[in-house]
């Protein structure tokens, strides 16, 4: 699968273009996270000047219906009044102390009350820190070196987890990016997702050396791919049988697909619960906040209570915890129902428009998260299937939507996110844009 070559979008964004040029002189690639650069779709990334509710406004003054929601955190919509008030009040008391605060206790209590397997919680500042710390803790707790992950699952830019599959089943991984050494990735094994046989084989070969299996609760970075029925339970059974920990990465799904994240949405109960979970995105309300937590006996191995070191100057930052606490408290059952209603309306309209235009596609869901695969396959359940997309069709679809004032994720391999603020007017604008975008996708099919 080759990367598409950049091509200009049909609409004009001169201020964004000028900012992108300036940014490229002082920021590698002109962005602070690669997907923002539009390399997968071509054209000029839109520089956002402001956001409110379901809308983004770019530096050229153009408004877009936002289907990124900051890649997931903005479940209430942008600049929600409750969150804005909480952040404003917290800022009046100072920005950072380097000491414990009541708010971090309140936020930890809120999460522990929501997610039954989480008995204790440690806060950090990013999802990458959360997964990095969780696998360190798993190794420290078990005394074992090997981590098992799934192909296509993304857990942040952790050296040990930036690894691709080897040439055969359950082979030790090679690093997937320059700068990650074979030593860093050498104790990581990558196996196919939703494959119980591969899981059994890797434990047959290496079971006494495996510290943990880490999995996205529902994959969202190869497009949305949920675990197949029975797979989560099998993960729990096999890891428990071999004395390995099960780590569920809920950075994306946590507090978005339900009040208790994927754990609550899937509803398998404590019998099949993971030992450790990681959180981010929604729990920070748009601010840098994340966490990892789980069984008290495992968490007790963290410093200062135990020997596994982990620390952070801004962990539990008072403004970030204020935003997170206000966000979670505002996430009522009515909010989750509104998000689900909005997501259902958009995904059904997208599928109908693509079908009418004769574009082969498949819509995968995980709660209110979803993605559209531009594929003729009947199902997408793993990374190899997810990669079989018509990227030319997606690229044309993306730019048509953008030109009509709807900002999708600029990659065919990302989830679409909606918020409780996506009202009938916002959804109507999306629905109105879809037929032309679907026709553009049909014309762009196979162009890459």
From Swiss-Prot:
> Cross-referenced SUPFAM superfamilies, in alphabetical order?
PLP-dependent transferases (SSF53383)
Q: Which residues form a coiled coil?
A: none
Could you tell me where this protein is found in the cell?
Cytoplasm
UniProtKB keywords: Cytoplasm, Isomerase, Porphyrin biosynthesis, Pyridoxal phosphate
Catalytic activity from the UniProt record: (S)-4-amino-5-oxopentanoate = 5-aminolevulinate
The keyword Transcription regulation is annotated on this UniProt entry? no
| Pfam entry (one) | Aminotran_3
Cellular component terms (Gene Ontology): cytoplasm
Xref: HAMAP family: HemL_aminotrans_3
Name of the protein described by the UniProt record:
Glutamate-1-semialdehyde 2,1-aminomutase
Name the species this protein comes from: Kineococcus radiotolerans (strain ATCC BAA-149 / DSM 14245 / SRS30216)
């Amino acid at each position: 699968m080759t990367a598409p070559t950049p091509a200009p979008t049909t609409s004009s964004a001169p201020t964004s273009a000028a900012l992108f040029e300036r940014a490229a002189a002082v920021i590698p690639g002109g962005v602070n996270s690669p997907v923002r650069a539009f390399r997968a779709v071509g054209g000029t990334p839109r520089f956002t000047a402001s956001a409110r509710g379901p809308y983004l406004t770019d530096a050229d003054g153009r408004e877009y219906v936002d289907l990124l929601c900051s890649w997931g955190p903005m479940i209430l919509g942008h600049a929600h009044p409750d969150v804005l008030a909480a952040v404003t009040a917290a800022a009046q008391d100072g920005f950072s102390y380097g000491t414990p605060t009541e708010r971090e206790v309140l936020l930890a209590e809120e999460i522990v009350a929501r997610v039954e397997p989480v008995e204790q919680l440690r806060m950090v500042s990013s999802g990458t820190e959360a997964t990095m710390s969780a696998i360190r803790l798993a190794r420290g707790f078990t005394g074992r070196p090997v981590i098992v992950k799934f192909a296509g699952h993304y857990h942040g830019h952790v050296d040990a987890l930036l690894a691709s599959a080897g040439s055969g089943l359950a082979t030790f991984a090679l690093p997937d990016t320059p700068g990650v050494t074979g030593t860093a990735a050498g104790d990581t094994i990558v196996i196919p997702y939703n494959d119980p046989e591969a899981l059994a084989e890797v434990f047959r070969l290496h079971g006494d050396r495996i510290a943990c299996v880490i999995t996205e609760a529902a994959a969202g970075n190869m497009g949305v791919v949920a675990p197949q029925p029975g797979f989560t339970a099998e993960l729990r059974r096999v890891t428990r049988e071999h004395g390995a920990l099960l780590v569920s990465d809920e950075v994306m799904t946590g507090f978005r697909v339900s009040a208790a994240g994927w754990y609550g949405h899937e509803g398998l109960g404590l019998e099949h619960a993971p030992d450790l979970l990681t959180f981010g995105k929604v729990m920070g309300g748009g601010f840098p906040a994340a966490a990892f937590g789980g069984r008290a006996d495992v968490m007790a191995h963290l410093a200062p209570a135990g020997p596994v070191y982990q620390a952070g100057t801004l962990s539990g930052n008072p403004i970030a915890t204020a935003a997170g606490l206000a966000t979670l408290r505002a996430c009522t059952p009515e909010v989750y129902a509104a998000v689900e209603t909005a997501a259902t309306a958009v995904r059904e309209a997208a599928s109908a428009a693509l079908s009418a235009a004769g574009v082969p596609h498949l819509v995968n869901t995980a709660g209110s998260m979803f993605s559209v695969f531009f594929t003729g396959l009947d199902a997408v359940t793993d990374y190899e299937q997810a990669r079989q997309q018509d990227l030319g069709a997606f690229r044309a679809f993306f730019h048509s939507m953008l030109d009509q004032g709807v900002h999708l994720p600029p990659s065919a391999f990302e989830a679409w996110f909606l918020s409780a603020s996506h009202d009938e007017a916002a959804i109507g604008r999306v629905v109105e844009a879809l037929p032309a975008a679907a026709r553009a996708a049909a014309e762009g099919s196979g162009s890459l």
